[in-house]
Amino acid sequence: STGSLPAPVRWSRSERAALSYGYGLSVSAVQLASAYTALANDGVRLQPSLLRLSEPPQGIPAISPTVANDLLNILETSVAAYTGGRRARVEGYRVGGKTGTVRKTGQQGYTTDAYRSVFAGIAPISDPRIVTVVMIDHPKAGEFYGGAVAAPVFSSVTGNALRLLDVPPDHDAE
């Protein structure tokens, strides 16, 4: 999927507001993961891979290292105990990420009963090694918020991946 993002010169005030919380654009899970690699890699965006690579991929500068670090800190607070992302926490590791709950579109615009639940995150925040995006299409269990549906899957998958990759736990993780 190529995704969809209107050209900035065409953004109205209402489009700017909607874009700030994720409406009016579309991205695939791989595109979202690619964007998160810039946060995990000092502002340099990498091409995502599902495989362990023998050589690191070439990156494209996307944002400054300072902005990337600031955003990592913000993402870490998004999984604090009192937030919707708390179910994404991985025991022994500092992680960060963002929940998302997307109303699906139909012929008449946004639906009222069909959702995509999303969690995109980075682990460990102290020395990023993994970007994981969980996207669950049309969850059926009654809950549909990203923090309730996708965040626990992120926690499980990312925790297992960190252990399989022998990433040492953080000493200062909750």
Question: What role is predicted for each listed range?
Answer:
Residues S1-P139, G146:
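Beta-lactam-recognizing serine transpeptidase/beta-lactamase-like catalytic domain environment
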Residues P56-G59, A151-E174:
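Short, gly/Ser/Thr-rich active-site loops of penicillin-recognizing serine hydrolases
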